[in-house]
Amino acid sequence: MRHPHLADLALSFPALLFALAVPRPDVDPERAIACVIAGRPLAEAAAAAGLPLWLRKLPPEAFVRPIPPLPNGELFRRQIGNHLPRSPKLMPTWLQLVAEMAALAHEAAAVWIAREYLRAPKRDHMHLLGLWIWFSGQPGCFGRELIERPWTPAMKLDAARTAAFAWRANTTLHLNIGQRPIRNMWLNPGRVGDYEFRPLDDIPAIVEEAVVMRNCVRTYDDDIAHNRSRLWSVWRNGERVATLETGLHCHDPLLNIVQLEGPGNAAAPRELWWIARRWLHLHDLPQIETGRIKWRQAPLDLATWRRLWRPYWLAKRRIPDWLPLAPSRAAFAAL
């Protein structure tokens, strides 16, 4: 490494010098070193080292770890120069995020994160953002069907994070509930006077209730999966009037009414509470076992998990450790 041509790289191409001194595990630097010593064009040496030429614009402070594979498409090269960090302190993380987002999603997403990280230097939930961005461009995929607001390059980072979190909430609902109706609702549908109690026992019913009643019952999927909650819709004269949650309350071993609320979470009238209690007590409560599951121990739905992620695995030609083949609550929560 003590050749004058190599030393010249400190000024002409710091990234290449760093890559030769601290190569990636999958790159043998000897061919690139030979190119430099022989006076070959820098483009040839960079290609041998697996580096894009646009890295010439970055100073030595940008490199603190082996340089990961980076995007190098023609459009990317034209755009990335507009989003280079001015602060040397931001450069190592910025470079890592550009590489990561290109691998997670695509080059357009890498340009986007290069820009947005400079506006708002946040780097959490990159796996989630990358998945949401990738599925945003995959019409026909189940993962795309669950996206309410798809990614566009014009989005700000905070708006993208909000949309990605909403997508994760939708995917969580499907992973927790699965594709089949909930088998044990604990109670039976019934009628008391003019009021009818209908089970919210599958995803379409829960989502429809959330939309019509303007409430957040579609976020109750964790409680449902762990047998801590069941949801019911209360109707009168052919219209929804309230949403009812049943479960165990405090130290009471018998099934109880946990919540009863009208449209928009309005307080239910006293009369409706009495009707709901009468319906509840039509059942043999001491004989009902909810089968509560220890928190975070309920399995996610295997068929839904693989239906959701299979297109991504195939497109990327790998199953990453952070998105395993077997359903994992820990892996999903870490996104």
Regions found by a protein language model. Give the residues of each.
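Glycine-focused motif/segment detector
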Residues: M1-L335
